[in-house]
Amino acid sequence: MLPNTGRLAGCTVFITGASRGIGKAIALKAAKDGANIVIAAKTAQPHPKLLGTIYTAAEEIEAVGGKALPCIVDVRDEQQINAAVEKAIKQFGGIDILVNNASAISLTNTLDTPTKRLDLMMNVNTRGTYLASKACIPYLKKSKVAHILNISPPLNLNPIWFKQHCAYTIAKYGMSMYVLGMAEEFKGEIAVNALWPKTAIHTAAMDMLGGPGIESQCRKVDIIADAAYSIFQKPKSFTGNFVIDESILKEEGIENFDVYAIKPGHPLQPDFFLDEYPEAVSKKMESTGAVPEFKEEKPQPQPKPRSGAVEETFRIVKDSLSDDVVKATQAVYLFELSGEDGGTWFLDLKSKGGNVGYGEPSDQADVVMSMTTDDFVKMFSGKLKPTMAFMSGKLKIKGNMALAIKLEKLMNQMNARL
């Protein structure tokens, strides 16, 4: 892990959402240098499901050598933000670093996102980041350190990151767009950057999204804390960057990233919004090494008589196949289904016209997907998003992830018929 240098001693770091998770980890890292930490978060009373309050975080910060100022702050409330900033100035004399970490998430599509949830994400992620930045900037401009760090992703306009959770993506990208604007607006005065993880990070939010067992596919919050610490030590000229945690730590000379893993050696889930997503996943999966090519139809194994929702799903899939679908996909998929009506099924989108069936395909599969029969039917009917199923561990994938993503297009075509 990245060692502390003491360079943040005496600096005041204002962190939203610092009572737990990534925000608290960044706070503790800076506190080890002897920094002053303003814990700007909502949680003043213990939560039945989420550990930590602003006061327990303050105790941890002071235990490692920092000074803490816990402030009850809902970033949707401008008055609470301004009051916390005033308290920070009164107690510590200034603000040197702002970390916009507070965030709200809902991985739902447009029709499944209630207006109330949309407003929450926009007001916490996009508006809250703006309000906190606006309140701190007059004091940051007086600092020799002067950093704003948004925990937000690089701006990636690939539609795949929009189509299943459009509202969340736009809310997070709002945070990222402030980096573009404010980095230019305050160039030479304040360094403004974004930080995003390469892999899933184990937090309470990830536990709720991913369910039991997801932690083994995650890294610890320490990797984000170390990456943030690296950014804080850079000059004001380091601005307008969208930093990935692993990349900046490699620049710092870190080579062993197993120290950040919850379960060293276990395949890690890539995070959203990264261009290298398919490549990063495929490196952790078993690759068949197959090269797509158009083939004449070959004899396929005769399907074993089946009954139920899985067979009906494959019947509808087969009725929808065409040469155009085959040409656009060029892959053989194998489905290992557990539960009632389970077994091994295949979808051949390489042979002319395409084919489906029960058992092993005649050609080696490019992608192997393992899940329950219930989740399989839900995925093809649009009730379970493949990305969410994969991130939560309900869907296991071996092989070419880029080809796995192509299958989503076919699933979307099936939704109206299932």
Swiss-Prot record:
Keywords: Acetylation, Hydroxylation, Mitochondrion, NADP, Oxidoreductase, Peroxisome. The modification N6-succinyllysine is found at residue 318. NADP(+) binds at residues 17-23, 42, 74, 172. The active site is at 168 (proton acceptor). The modification N6-(2-hydroxyisobutyryl)lysine is found at residue 42. Residues 306-415 form the SCP2 domain. One of its GO terms (cellular component) is peroxisome. Its EC number is 1.-.-.-. The modification N6-acetyllysine is found at residue 116. InterPro entries: HSDL2 (IPR051935), NAD(P)-bd_dom_sf (IPR036291), Sc_DH/Rdtase_CS (IPR020904), SCP2_sterol-bd_dom (IPR003033), SCP2_sterol-bd_dom_sf (IPR036527), SDR_fam (IPR002347). Residues 287-310 are annotated as: Disordered. Its main location: other. Pfam families: adh_short, SCP2. PROSITE patterns: ADH_SHORT. It is found in: Peroxisome; Mitochondrion. One of its GO terms (molecular function) is oxidoreductase activity. Belongs to the short-chain dehydrogenases/reductases (SDR) family. Has apparently no steroid dehydrogenase activity. Controls bile acid (BA) and lipid metabolism in response to nutritional cues. This is Hydroxysteroid dehydrogenase-like protein 2. It comes from Pongo abelii (Sumatran orangutan). The gene is HSDL2.
